[in-house]
Each structure stands twice: as structure tokens, then as C-alpha cells.
């Protein structure tokens, strides 16, 4: 598997969770002998929702909610077979979405 690259994208609502998962991935990849670039923080997506509190009148009474989606990007250069096996066996937190691409 030489001259290849594994690109890993992480998404989560909690920044502490995504940082912990990223450090676990980096530690696992380095332990198996691969080079790691990252984690690179990507822009945080913020979605804001405004909801009327009152069902009838009082248009000025509103609540605002916000969801932040944090993203990280990592490249694992020259992965070995041990690296791929270790990454597949890695148990990450439930709140982290992981996308893996082989190039």
C-alpha cells in the first residue's frame, strides 16, 4: 500500500469529542509507522433557528437556537496494512461522523 493516502474527515457537534477522536486516530497511525498530516480544522458550520415563543400575538418574543458543526481533516501518508487494520478496529465516540477515502 505504498504511495497511497488515506483522507479522513471528522464531523461532530462537540469540539472536545472531535479533538479526542482526532488525537486517537493520529496516535494509532503513528504507532503503526505511517506519517500523518493534520488534524486540520475546517470552518465551523453554524445554523441558527429563530422560533416564535407565543402561538398567537407578541411577534417580538422569540427564541434563537444554534447548531455548530465542527470539522477536521487528516491525511495519512504511506499507510501500511497494519495501519488500515488498526484504523478499522479503532472504536471512536458515537457522536463523531467519520468519512474515509483511499486515494
From Swiss-Prot:
Keyword presence, Ribosomal protein: yes
Entry keyword annotation includes Phosphoprotein: no
| GO biological process terms on file | translation
Task: Read off the SUPFAM superfamilies from this record.
Answer: Ribosomal protein S10 (SSF54999)
GO cellular component terms attached to this protein's record: ribonucleoprotein complex; ribosome
Q: Which UniProt keywords apply?
A: Ribonucleoprotein, Ribosomal protein
The protein's superkingdom reads Bacteria
Q: Which InterPro entries match?
A: Ribosomal_uS10, Ribosomal_uS10_CS, Ribosomal_uS10_dom, Ribosomal_uS10_dom_sf
Q: Which SMART domains match?
A: Ribosomal_S10 (SM01403)
Q: Which one of the record's GO molecular function terms can you name? A: tRNA binding
The family this protein is said to belong to: Belongs to the universal ribosomal protein uS10 family.
So what does this one do?
Answer: Involved in the binding of tRNA to the ribosomes.
Listed under subunit, the entry gives: Part of the 30S ribosomal subunit.
Q: What is this protein called?
A: Small ribosomal subunit protein uS10
Q: Which organism is it from?
A: Thioalkalivibrio sulfidiphilus (strain HL-EbGR7)
Amino acid at each position: 500500500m505504498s504511495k497511497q493516502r488515506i483522507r479522513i474527515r471528522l464531523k461532530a457537534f462537540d469540539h472536545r469529542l472531535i479533538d479526542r477522536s482526532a488525537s486517537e486516530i493520529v496516535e494509532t497511525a503513528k504507532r503503526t509507522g505511517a506519517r500523518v498530516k493534520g488534524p486540520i480544522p475546517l470552518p465551523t458550520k453554524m445554523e441558527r433557528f429563530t422560533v416564535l415563543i407565543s402561538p398567537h400575538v407578541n411577534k417580538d418574543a422569540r427564541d434563537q437556537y444554534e447548531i455548530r458543526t465542527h470539522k477536521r481533516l487528516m491525511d495519512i501518508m504511506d499507510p501500511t496494512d497494519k495501519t488500515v487494520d488498526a484504523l478499522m478496529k479503532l472504536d471512536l465516540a458515537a457522536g463523531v461522523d467519520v468519512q474515509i477515502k483511499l486515494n
